[in-house]
């Protein structure tokens, strides 16, 4: 879909660039596939902020998207494409032959009336879901499971895709958009194609209020805080304290690695930030 620009009738519209969503469904979502969603405002059960810069925003209904795609060998027809406020990608409403409705992440080039299916012998076309062992090497994929039958966890946001680059002793080798090369069990499912809405990255909000509608609160620099709030806080005038940049919790930022190792690191063949 194309991008929309606007006449500068106000300062908030001068730089505004949005994705044209005129081809999407304009009505309400399917009621049986939606549920209420309460805003946490970045707080935990003690009421303390655990995630900064969250709060406010427009109320949303949660669309129950099927990330497992476990209805094997039952064709489904794409009824319509919809906007989903809870994610950057568009979603597709599909109807199985037995009448059941479901939402899935819409890949690029998926049109209304197309047929999608989950099958080990499915055609290699956008929207079809197959085990990694059944997908040809070199295929562009998204919606990738990390554990069999757990549901897709990787490559779900707008415009993203990964590439199957090899298979070896029960594992598939997948190259992610970040440049990381990692192994996943070849019994895990993945969907063919790249995720819809690739122009999302080119949107320009143009005003603070548009981010507030999305539930994003301002980011305050540590150097303008008090010493009790941040390691960079305090001092007379615009002083930074003379230390290297750190997070509010004292961890070094802007360069040094602070990530802890995980058991699954052994599945990463090449790190995303490895020098090529």
Curated annotation (Swiss-Prot):
One of the primary rRNA binding proteins. Required for association of the 30S and 50S subunits to form the 70S ribosome, for tRNA binding and peptide bond formation. It has been suggested to have peptidyltransferase activity; this is somewhat controversial. Makes several contacts with the 16S rRNA in the 70S ribosome. Residues 251-260 have a biased composition (Basic residues). This is Large ribosomal subunit protein uL2. The gene is rplB. The lineage of its organism: Bacteria, Pseudomonadati, Pseudomonadota, Alphaproteobacteria, Hyphomonadales. InterPro entries: NA-bd_OB-fold, Rib_uL2_dom2, Ribosomal_uL2, Ribosomal_uL2_bac/org-type, Ribosomal_uL2_C, Ribosomal_uL2_CS, Ribosomal_uL2_dom3, Ribosomal_uL2_RNA-bd_dom. It comes from Hyphomonas neptunium (strain ATCC 15444). Residues 223-276 are annotated as: Disordered. GO terms for molecular function: rRNA binding; structural constituent of ribosome; transferase activity. Belongs to the universal ribosomal protein uL2 family. Part of the 50S ribosomal subunit. Forms a bridge to the 30S subunit in the 70S ribosome. Gene3D superfamilies: 2.30.30.30, Nucleic acid-binding proteins, Ribosomal protein L2, domain 3. Signal peptide: none annotated. GO terms for biological process: cytoplasmic translation. GO terms for cellular component: large ribosomal subunit. Keywords: Ribonucleoprotein, Ribosomal protein, RNA-binding, rRNA-binding.
């Amino acid at each position: 879909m194309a991008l929309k620009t606007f006449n500068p009738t106000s300062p908030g519209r001068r730089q505004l660039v949005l994705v044209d969503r005129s081809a999407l469904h304009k009505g309400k979502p399917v009621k049986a596939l939606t549920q209420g969603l309460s805003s946490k405002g970045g707080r935990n059960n003690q009421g303390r902020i655990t995630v900064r810069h969250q709060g406010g925003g427009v109320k949303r209904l949660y669309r129950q998207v099927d990330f497992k795609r476990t209805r094997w060998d039952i064709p489904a027809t794409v009824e319509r494409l919809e906007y989903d406020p809870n994610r950057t990608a568009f979603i597709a409403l599909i109807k199985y032959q037995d009448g059941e409705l479901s939402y899935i992440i819409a890949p690029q080039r998926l049109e209304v009336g197309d047929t999608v299916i989950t099958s080990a012998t499915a055609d290699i076309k956008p929207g079809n879901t197959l085990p990694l062992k059944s997908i040809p090497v070199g295929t562009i994929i998204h919606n990738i499971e990390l554990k069999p039958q757990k549901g897709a966890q990787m490559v779900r946001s707008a415009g993203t895709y990964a590439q199957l680059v090899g298979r070896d002793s029960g594992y598939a080798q997948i190259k992610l958009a970040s440049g990381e090369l990692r192994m996943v069990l070849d019994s895990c499912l993945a969907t063919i194609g790249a995720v819809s809405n690739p122009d999302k990255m080119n949107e320009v909000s143009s005003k603070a209020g548009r981010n507030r509608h999305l539930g994003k609160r301002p980011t305050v620099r540590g150097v303008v805080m008090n010493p009790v709030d941040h390691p960079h806080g305090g001092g007379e005038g615009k002083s930074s304290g003379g230390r290297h940049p750190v997070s509010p919790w004292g961890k070094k930022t802007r360069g040094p690695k602070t990530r802890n190792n995980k058991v699954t690191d052994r599945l990463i063949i090449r790190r995303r930030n490895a020098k090529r």
